[in-house]
Amino acid sequence: MKKNFAGSTLVVLSVGLSGSVYAQSSVTLYGTVDAGVIYSTNQQVTNANGSVSGGHAVQLGGGNLVPSRWSLMGTEDLGGGIKASFDLENQFLTGTGAMLQSGSLFNRQAWVGLGDARFGTLTAGRQYDSYSDFLGVYASSNSWATQYGSHFGDIDNLNEAFNFNNALKFTSVDFGGLTFGGTFSLGGQAGNFAAKRGYSLAAAYNHGPVSLSAGYLSLNQPLDAALGGASGYIGDLSCANAAANYCTLQSASSLKAWGAGGSVVIDKATLALVYTHTRLQNSQYFASAANPGGTGVSFDIAELNAVYNFTPAWTLAAAYIFNNAKVSGGSSTRFHQINLGTNYALSKRTALYMVAIAQKSSGAGLGVDPATGSNVNYAQIPNLVNSNSDRQLAVMAGVRVNF
């Protein structure tokens, strides 16, 4: 999710260097707290005899519209257009107060860097990758549809379910509407430079009401390299929140994705379109005694969304997401998803929201019936336990406060 917050400055210092030249530094605390009630249908339950059934659930969800988190961001003006900066960002669970990832204090970002006003900024540490930065702005889940409205399991990482560890990242300044960036994650394994290595490239062009972006992402051993063997906040594809049917899908030798998107502002309306192609190579989800190496699977995802601002405080929005999943040498499964939402800003920092998400799966089916082993269509709204059928619905209402 994107990180646009109005923070509170804790410290501002001016240190004399020589004559009238001063270095100014600041440290800012910023973040958000988000919570809401979620009603969902058909959450799968495994019975004692191995069969599955479904039930409705009412839950308290935290970090829905925007992940609940806090951050310390610092900058220092070194003069001559050069600035040093850092960001340390922690995500937590609103319902329990626990960290999202045990043992990882700054699980979202931990980086330091230098920026030049003429060229751009180079940063080092754990951080969001360039592909997700440039393309994620066109996904409804990053503005109003909540993380539950993201693409299937956030398989294309537009919601930044996984970040890059041990990464170097460059982001350019605006050159007449053109910006670009790249991220390189060092795997750090002796004797195997490619192990857990990742990189991404992206560019964007903005002119008046029109915005266009394109990017590419490559990550080896994504489950271990970016997620540490556990899930990012989207969840169930990596078994974080429950024993989901799609566990181990991201346990693959590599993940490669590319995409393009754009948006246009027309009076009070904003229209956006984004397309991504993601391929997981040798996914262990498809492994068997006869095929221990796993099988490749690709996802072609297209999203069209629209937001209409009735007033500066009140918006209505809708999105349609189509996802075609194809197993190498095999069959296809299609996921259709509709997101509907409304937001009302009580102030610059506080907003109320209500979102409804419906998903339907069709085709051969990516799910596996635990009792029979046959392929079935199991819908799964991101961050929920997968459905016991080809349909699932979620409705939520909550409040988000930025600080």
Q: Where are the regions that the model predicts?
A:
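Gram-negative outer-membrane beta-barrel proteins
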Residues: V37-V45, F92-A98, S130-F134, G188-N192, ...
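Outer membrane beta-barrel
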Residues: Q24-Y39, A57-G187, A195-Y199, A204-L217, ...
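Bacterial N-terminal signal peptides
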Residues: T9-S18
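Detector for outer-membrane/organellar transmembrane beta-barrel domains
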Residues: A202-G341, I357, D390
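Extracellular loop and loop/strand-boundary signature of outer-membrane beta-barrel proteins
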Residues: G54-V58, A98, I155, G187-G188, ...
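Outer-membrane beta-barrel "beta-signal"
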Residues: L346, S387-F403
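Sec/Tat signal peptide C-region and signal peptidase I cleavage site
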Residues: G19-A23
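Bacterial N-terminal signal peptides that target proteins for export
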Residues: M1-S8
